Design a protein with these regions (language model features):
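C-terminal catalytic/motor cores of large multi-domain enzyme assemblies
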Residues: 1-123
Length: 123
């Protein structure tokens, strides 16, 4: 799995650009070993294959892995009316030697807020 290092010091744009470059090199089988070393958090997305929900296994040395499922349109209630809405299943597996379950839950709550209201990421 390609690793984007020092993401806390990069903008969303820089992370996006680097992710695209690493994905292209991975597809072309041109990744270097150093580009796959040192991960702490992994994102596994099977949603693009129509998989709605799954549980990933943490690859060491990562502390967590986030499983991202497909976006599915379902009826939701908004302002008292039933309307079409998009839902997506996320699952977070944490190594409890390094990440407490409550910390993982807080992360998922924050991520949910960001996904439902993307502008909050910029504030």
């Amino acid at each position: 799995v390609p690793v984007i290092k020092f993401t806390d010091q990069k903008s969303f744009s820089q992370i996006s650009t680097e992710a695209k470059e690493l994905a292209k090199r991975a597809k072309d089988k041109k990744l270097q070993p150093a580009e796959m070393d040192g991960n702490t958090f992994t994102v596994s997305n099977l949603g693009m294959f129509g998989i709605e929900s799954f549980t990933s296994i943490i690859n060491m040395p990562a502390s967590c892995i986030l499983s991202v499922g497909a976006i599915k349109q379902v009826p939701v209630v908004k302002n008292g009316a039933v309307v079409p809405g998009n839902t997506m299943m996320l699952s977070l597996a944490c190594d409890h030697r390094t990440v407490d379950g409550a910390t993982g839950a807080a992360f998922l709550q924050t991520l949910k807020t960001f996904i439902e209201n993307p502008v909050t990421m910029l504030v």
